[in-house]
Structure formats: C-alpha cells, structure tokens
C-alpha cells in the first residue's frame, strides 16, 4: 500500500481550475505593478535608506570613500564623513 492521503487537493486539480486562474490573473500582475511603482517612485530608496544614484557623490567629494589603513580606520572614516 502506498502513502496515505493528506486530504488536500492535488496540485494538478488546483492549477487547472478556472477559479485559480481568475484569482491569479489579478494578483500576479498587481504584484508586478506594485513593485514597479515602489522602485520608480523612489519609495524603495526611502524605505531601505539607500542613497539615490545622484547622491553617491557630492559636489565637494568626488573620490571614492576608501579606507587605506586599517589601524587608523576610525580616523579615516571620521574624515570621510565630515560634512555629510
């Protein structure tokens, strides 16, 4: 005797039902639209605290903020972030 039944509907029955496709034909495109709006409006930058592409380099600081000496890293970071 093979394994017992859990009483759940078989997956093949679910994906071939009209009800499944009516529900998912609305929800799946809605998720893509919501994601597009989340990114295109800039809300993603605000929500996650990442700088926008035009905010990586200021007019005063055009070089890459690179730490060169690991023993004086704290002082270098303070110098790099001064004026932010």
From Swiss-Prot:
Keyword check for Endoplasmic reticulum: no
SUPFAM superfamilies, alphabetized: Cytochrome b559 subunits
Top-level taxon of the source organism: Eukaryota
GO CC, one annotated term: chloroplast thylakoid membrane
Localisation: Plastid, Chloroplast thylakoid membrane
Biological processes annotated in GO: photosynthetic electron transport chain
Chain segments annotated as transmembrane: 22-36
Keywords from the named record: Chloroplast, Electron transport, Heme, Iron, Membrane, Metal-binding, Photosynthesis, Photosystem II, Plastid, Thylakoid, Transmembrane, Transmembrane helix, Transport
InterPro entries xref list: PSII_cyt_b559_asu, PSII_cyt_b559_asu_sf, PSII_cyt_b559_CS, PSII_cyt_b559_N, PSII_cytb559_asu_lum
HAMAP family the UniProt entry points to: PSII_PsbE (MF_00642)
Function: This b-type cytochrome is tightly associated with the reaction center of photosystem II (PSII). PSII is a light-driven water:plastoquinone oxidoreductase that uses light energy to abstract electrons from H(2)O, generating O(2) and a proton gradient subsequently used for ATP formation. It consists of a core antenna complex that captures photons, and an electron transfer chain that converts photonic excitation into a charge separation.
PANTHER family from the UniProt entry: CYTOCHROME B559 SUBUNIT BETA-RELATED
Record's protein name: Cytochrome b559 subunit alpha
Provenance organism: Emiliania huxleyi
Organismal lineage: Eukaryota, Haptista, Haptophyta, Prymnesiophyceae, Isochrysidales
Gene this protein is translated from: psbE
